[in-house]
Every structure is written in structure tokens, then in C-alpha cells.
Amino acid sequence: MSDATVERDAALFAPLARTGPGFYWTVAVLGLMILWGAVAYWTQFDQGLGVTGLQQPVSWGFYVTNFVFFIGISHAGTLISAILRLSKAEWRRPITRMAEVITVMVLFIGAGQILVDLGRPDRLMNVILYGRYQSPLLWDATSISAYLTASTLYLYLPLIPDIAILRDHLGKRRFLYSVLALGWTGTEHQQKVLNRAIAIMAVLVIPIAVSVHTVVSFVFSMTIQPMWHSSIFGPYFVAGAIFSGIAALIVAMAIIRRIYHLEAYLKPVHFRYLGYLLLVMTLLWFYLTFAEYLTGYYGNEPEEMKVFWAKFTGPFWPLFWAMVFCNLVLPMILLVRLQHHAIGKTVIASASVVVGMWLERFNIIVPTLSNPRLPFPEGHYWPTWVEWGETAGSFGLFILFYVLFVKLFPIISIWEIREGREAGLREVEERLRTYLPDGPYPAPGHEGAKAAT
């Protein structure tokens, strides 16, 4: 890549080259959150799960809620990015890497929630060594491991050309970039092999991503607990994962755009298109939620209705109706018309959906366990400071991972932006030739073509 091109995209190098006080303040705050989580986990590890609000019959609470939530957020990256790549949506270029990084980071955090939830984390390997292959828990471990491996590879492959650019033009961390660039020089053969590998991975990760949250839903639906034993849970969980993933991506885009002044790359059109996708997923989420609860209501089974009314009018009604407001009412109000103030509307709606989808996971898990089918007394769950600390630490660790990635690598793909410019110029030239007389049209890379962009 020429020095002129590097200078043109200098804004993409700025987060890597300069470190302001805001970075250190952010890391300090996140460090405090992580420290709180570490103290909470050590307290739990030392004294046992009795220091949490988990008890019979409510044996799952914040930890499993966070697990399902983080695994769902992971669909922001690999699945959405892969679909946009395969559909050749040109507007995807500035946002794909942001989405892919979210996937890899939250998968690590999500898988860690299972470790936190275990009373004996030292026995985790027993799931692999002695687990029953008929168990959805073993399927879960297998599918998440496969998804994490595929997503990491899918993030790394498009990163290689940009790492080579950093190796050649950024003095700091040159040894690291030289190792990770794998000898990339940008030859035609290398580009051909890379594009083929990315295309293959894009095809592979879609069924893997869908299978992951389907298997997560099996952990619930393959029991006979009220409001869990349902065949709709597979598509319901996948749709919810995509819904929360799009919302998380929009929030990340807005923050990065604001902090690093990337308005030239993350434009209103990107927020508008993702806002339309979010609106579609809002309607799909409402359809699946309505179908699930309507079916349970008409079945009128006593155990099911006990959980049903606990959510609608019972002790969980504030959380249930807050979920409906965050996932349906507010997004519908904001996203129906995006011609004006598209960025502000989509960001507010997305932040609402992120909160609403966490509440949805909680509403799926805790009300059912509080009203079990077996003749246990009605359960009550209230998280202790340990669970709040673990949750804060998990979110802090995810954000810290993301911040460090932005500090080490371009969060917007430099080579894909350049490729998009050249492809756009070629497309314009081809269109001009169809209805204008033949003439000297500037080729991509020519000074006239550069002036046109």
C-alpha cells in the first residue's frame, strides 16, 4: 500500500499511534470492575456457592443468564458479517471487523460464565472425559468450542493484510506484526488464496453459529420444566441472538465513531441499514414471543399457567413488562421512520434492546425455576453482591478486551476500504460506458480517479 493511501486513511491509524488520557482512565475504570469481579469470584471459590442467591429450587440465576446473553451477542459478528460478505453488501466494509471482534471476545466471556457457575471448576474436564454424549451440556461444550475456533480464524484471515500494513508503516510493535503477518506481501496469488479462504469460512460459520444457540436452547427445552419444554425454543433463541447481536454492534459502532472521530467511515447510512435490520428482528422477536406465550396460555396446564401469571402479573411482572418495552415498544417508536436522526434513533433503540434481551434471558430462566413442576416450595431468588460483582467483572473484561484490540489493530479494515473504493470506481466506469460515448475514463488508482473520491 502506498504512502499516499496510508495518509488518506490516517484516521484509522490514529488509535494505534496515539494514546490519550481517556484511554488510561477507561482502562482504570474497567480494571476496578474486573477487580470487583475477581474479589467476588475468590469469595465464592473460597466459601462456596452459599455466598450467592442460588438455592433450591432456583439453582440458575445471573451466571446462566449472562451465559445465554453473551453467547447470543456473539451472533453480532460472525453470523452477520458472513451473511453480509456472501451477499456482497458493499456497505458492510467499515463494520465487519467490529462485529467479528465482538464475537470472539464475548465467546470467551460467555464460556467463562459456566466456570463461574460451577461449584467445583476443577472438575470441568469431567464434562469432556466422562460426559454422556446424549446430554445437551456436552453438545453445548462441543458447539461453543467449534464456534470459537471458527470465529477466531474468521477474524484473523481478513486481518492479515492490515497487519502487514502496520508492519510496513508503523514503527511500534513491528516484531509482533511481522510474526502475525505470516509473510504477507500482497501478491496476486496471496490475495486469491485469502479471498477463497474468507469465502469458505463465511459459508462454514453460518451453520455453526445457528447450531450454537440452537444447542443452548436444548439445555432448557429438553427438560419438562414449565415454559421450557417447547419446540419453538431453537428458532426463538437464534432469532433473539441475532436481535441482540445487531443491537450490540450498533452500540459499539456509535461509541467507536464518537471516540475516534470516524464519521467519514461510519456514516448515517450504516446506522440506517442496521436500523432496518433491527426493526425486522424486533417484529420477528415479537412474533415468536407472542406465539410461545399464546400457545402456553391456550394449553392452560396448571404448572405452565403458574409461571405464565408469575411473569404477567406476579412477582416478575416489572421485569417482564420492562423486557417488552425495551424489545418492542421503544424500538418500534424509534425505528419506524429513520429518514432523520438515524444515528441517534438506532443507538437509543439498540441500547434498549441490549438491556431488554438480558431481561428476556432472566425471564426465561428464573421464573420457571421459582415455580417448579416438582412439589418444591415456591422459590425466591435475589442476587448477592457476589453475583453483581461477577457480572460487572464480566462486562468490564469484555470491554477491556475490545479496547485493547482497538489499540493494537485497525478496528476498520483498511484493505477492504481501499478495495471498496476501487470496486466503486470500476462500477461507475462500466455504467458510464453503457450510455455515454467512449472516452478516456480514469482507471482506479489514476490521479483523476483519486480526485473523484
Question: What is the predicted role of each segment?
Answer:
Residues 1-76, 402-403, 432-439, 452-453:
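N-terminal signal-anchor module of multipass membrane proteins
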Residues 76-87, 149-164, 248-258, 328-344, ...:
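Transmembrane alpha-helical segments in integral membrane proteins
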Residues 12-41, 89-91, 129-133, 140-323, ...:
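Long, contiguous internal "core" modules enriched in hydrophobic/ aromatic residues
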Residues 68-72, 139-152, 317-328, 384-403:
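Hydrophobic alpha-helical transmembrane segments
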Residues 97-109, 199-208, 272-283, 349-360:
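Transmembrane alpha-helical segments of multi-pass membrane proteins
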Residues 59-122:
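Membrane helical hairpin/interfacial module
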Residues 2-5, 327-330, 341-453:
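TerminUS-proximal long segments
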Residues 42-43, 47, 114-127, 156, ...:
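Transmembrane alpha-helix boundary signature
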